[in-house]
Amino acid sequence: MEVKDVSFSYDKDSPIVFENINFSIEKGDVLCILGPNGTGKTTLIKTINGFHDVNSGTVLLNGTNIKEMSYNDIAKLVGYIPQGHVPSFPFKVFDVVLMGRSPYINLSASPKEEDKEIALNALRTLGIEDLKEKSYTNLSGGERQLVFLARVLAQEPDLLILDEPTNHLDFGNQIKLLEMIEQLSNLGLAAIMSSHYPDHAFLAASKVAIMKDKTFIDFGTPEEVLTEENLHKAYGIDVKLVELEDNRKICVPLKTNLELVMSNYSKKFKLNDK
């Protein structure tokens, strides 16, 4: 995917949501888009996936302008996992994953044996074949997210786009999902994911973009982009980058001025109480 000078607003009278967005990713890349709440990450994810028309600029998939592609053609190249998917019907897990074959099946046709085998292989790839007969609605949040990822893999896309994929997952399931994204990239899939957590980029990403003030304030490798200065610009707090024994870094937030504010409030409360 290549994104060139992309800007977007919901209509001509609405303020710009983001502007001058530029990046490209290749086979095996994982791009993590970081930024505070309300900065436009989800809108950007939907725009590059073809759900919104850009005001200006172009989004290219394998060299083709996404505006010139049908949703079916996009679905054959891009697998999309939205934020906080809530199941509506108690489908079996296997049937949910089999739905990923929809771009390849005519509306009047039924899935072929080849489609079923591809769906089964997607479950095997993620190590969740044992869930195939279970009801999707009865799964835990972490299991549902893995099943949805299997459904996307059944599409056989070149690119995964994930909007805050670890949202509502406990710590263990967050790590498992990020490790799975990294493993899939090692198999040649490209991925774009949004997150609130810089540590997610250190764990799984080869490229990072920080989104703030309607655009990317930096783009590059995690080592280049995730500096203490950039993280302060993005989130308004001081952090310390700590290097672990395996040369991996983590972000440790330092104390904010909240402690001072609460201390002053407490003193004022005690004075008023007298």
List each model region and its residues:
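Conserved ABC ATPase signature
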Residues: 135-139, 143
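Helix-to-loop junction immediately C-terminal to a conserved catalytic motif
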Residues: 49
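The feature captures the beta-strand-to-loop junction immediately N-terminal to the Walker
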Residues: 34-36
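Conserved ABC ATPase "signature" region
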Residues: 98, 113-131, 156
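ABC ATPase nucleotide-binding domains
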Residues: 234-274
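Catalytic Walker B motif of ABC-type/P-loop ATPase nucleotide-binding domains
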Residues: 160-164
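Conserved ABC transporter NBD signature motif
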Residues: 57-65, 74
